[in-house]
């Protein structure tokens, strides 16, 4: 259940979820991303208060934040990584290891599989 603070900011969170539906954030960053200053403790507090069922942690070229938080959060954590390639950015989910930097989008897609 979302915290009262989260519901005050986002009233739709108070609505009951229909059977089988989940609240999911598919794209989040921690301080490991380089463009976020959110520490693991701050991230854990925010996600804990959010009422999310699943969060995908998709730091830029890193999975350290997701791995660190995977066992600390009450919700399910999907380990992801946002990769920059010459063809654009790609998000890989359900990763077990980091995808190497500097590879082509084709090789990145193969590594994610």
Question: What would you call each of these model-derived segments?
Answer:
Residues 88-95:
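A basic- and aromatic-enriched beta-loop-alpha substructure that forms the phosphate/nucleotide-
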